[in-house]
């Protein structure tokens, strides 16, 4: 989960529903333990067994939990380890939760790419909906806190941008790129996997669409000002992730109230802070964080074309294994 920031609907009062969702800050938002209206459901605990047509999954532990879902480490068919995501009912109608689950399943099955998390199975058990995904080592968020080496930043950005470009080419906007949804697996070098397509949006040939919901701290200026998202919105969010890697702290105080975050986003604070770094990499990040989409990079390919020319990339050393 993103530290400090809830999610908000767009162009609506902060407690108003949009496409079946409400804000996490709203008193109207149900507690995550609730089921489908008055119908309670039992969430899995360590030791529980989940059953699919393809086999069973034994729950080992909870990897992460939020208001819209929880992820469990499980041992599945052939004793392989999986990250099994549960879609939380959150007091919504059964059909709505089923539709959300089916949308994410379809999206992941259609988006096969080395830098997109792989889905192996999808099933319903005990009235709850699950996705069995490849198990990665940890989210990028676990690596943050101090500035990273620029060569490593560019390598992680390269893979993230490859995923973002793949989404662009398939008319999909992720809408939720942050360090918790950028997963890392370590082999001889870090492998990036973009996860959580629960609120992703298909453009259907359009330049921009109204998103379902967005985290306060990663709102692109166009979402805040006009309530729409576009391909450049994902680039803006990727720029925020790169800033965090470069500086060791986020561009915005994620614990700040919504009104303060909105003011800083509207004023271009993230871009100004990136410019203040005064390095070639900082300038690339600053361009990704410009307030107007037309002044950002036109695509993830354009970002990479600049990154690959930086000395930090050309002179990079071997990447750490852990």
Segments predicted by a language model, with ranges:
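Conserved short submotifs of the Hanks-type protein kinase catalytic core
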Residues: 126-139
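Catalytic-loop of the protein kinase fold
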Residues: 168-185
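Conserved N-lobe ATP-binding subsite of Hanks-type protein kinase domains
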Residues: 70
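AlphaC helix of the eukaryotic protein kinase fold
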Residues: 91-110
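Activation-segment/catalytic-loop signature of the eukaryotic protein kinase fold
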Residues: 122
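Activation segment signature within eukaryotic-like protein kinase domains
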Residues: 156-157
């Amino acid at each position: 989960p993103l530290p400090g920031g809830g999610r908000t609907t767009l162009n609506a009062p902060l407690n108003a529903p949009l496409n079946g969702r409400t804000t996490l800050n709203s008193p109207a938002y149900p507690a995550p333990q609730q089921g489908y209206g008055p119908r309670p459901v039992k969430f899995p605990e360590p030791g529980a067994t989940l059953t699919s047509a393809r086999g069973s999954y034994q729950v080992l532990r909870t990897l992460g939990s939020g208001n819209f879902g929880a992820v469990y480490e499980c041992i599945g068919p052939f004793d392989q380890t999986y990250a099994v995501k549960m879609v939380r009912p959150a007091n919504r109608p059964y059909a709505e939760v089923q539709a959300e689950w089916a949308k994410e399943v379809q999206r992941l099955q259609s988006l096969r790419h080395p830098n997109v998390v792989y889905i192996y199975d999808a099933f319903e058990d005990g009235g709850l909906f699950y996705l069995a995904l490849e198990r990665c080592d940890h989210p990028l968020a676990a690596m943050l806190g101090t500035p990273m080496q620029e060569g490593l930043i560019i390598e992680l950005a390269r893979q993230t941008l490859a995923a973002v470009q793949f989404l662009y080419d398939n008319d999909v906007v992720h809408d939720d790129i942050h360090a918790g949804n950028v997963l890392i697996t370590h082999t001889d070098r870090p492998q990036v996997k973009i996860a959580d397509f629960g609120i992703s949006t298909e453009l259907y040939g359009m330049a921009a669409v109204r998103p379902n919901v967005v985290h306060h701290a990663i709102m692109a200026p166009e979402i805040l000002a006009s309530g729409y998202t576009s391909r450049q919105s994902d680039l803006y969010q990727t720029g925020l992730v790169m800033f965090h890697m470069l500086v060791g702290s986020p561009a915005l105080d994620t614990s700040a109230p919504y009104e303060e975050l909105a003011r800083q986003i509207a004023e271009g604070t993230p871009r100004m802070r990136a410019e203040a770094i005064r390095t070639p990499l900082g300038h690339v990040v600053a361009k990704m964080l410009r307030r107007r989409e037309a002044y950002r990079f036109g695509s993830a390919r354009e970002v990479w074309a600049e990154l690959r020319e930086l000395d930090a990339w050309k002179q990079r050393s071997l990447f750490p294994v852990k």
